[in-house]
Amino acid sequence: MFQFLFFDLDDTLLDFHRAEAIAVSKAFRDMGVTPTPERIRQYSAVNKRHWQMLEQGLLTREQVLVQRFACLFQELDIPADPVACQAAYEEYLCVGHYFIEGAEALLAALAPKYRLYLASNGTARVQESRLKSAGIGPYFEQVFISQNLGANKPSPAFFQRCFARIPDFDPKKALMIGDSLTSDIRGANGAGIAACWFLSLIHISEPTRLAL
């Protein structure tokens, strides 16, 4: 029987796609860039590629945060400042939280019966702010964010550092719940714990390739 439940945050509990689109639109306007739907989609694709490179160990977090905007503005041939855009985007993202349908009720139902933990690859300042804004922080015994741990999902180091901080932890009673095959599911399998893949409507339209 499972006792330790690890939850991913973005697109598992909170709708990151929606928060991202709103934050990017506002940041673009600050830069004098018209936030068309096509540009928002293009940013999302560029951002996803950069986070995948982080998961593969090809980029650092600091490189991802600025280079995604630098790459996008180069593709669009727009002379905007990627550093300033990243700063504006982060400010707007900090205050944006939108629940995946049923997520809050699920946490409320599970918290009295299981030990809940958050396991996120997001930036610490942003994720901590969104957790506070959403009011779901108290459901978790501990919040594990890759920037604070010094390791990213799916690396075994991320999970081992989480496990080491949990009293009486038993990997046989642990379950990772997340939407990403490459970071959540692959990471859990590599760390020797069970995994539950959350396939939301956000991903239905995207090609799915098993990452195991």
What are these regions (language model features)?
Residues 81, 138-142, 170-174:
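Short acidic capping loops at alpha-helix termini that bridge into adjacent secondary structure
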Residues 84-87, 92-96, 103-134, 140-146, ...:
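Substrate-recognition element of Asp-dependent hydrolases with the DxDx(T/V) motif
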Residues 202-212:
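Single conserved hydrophobic/aromatic residue that forms the stacking wall/gate
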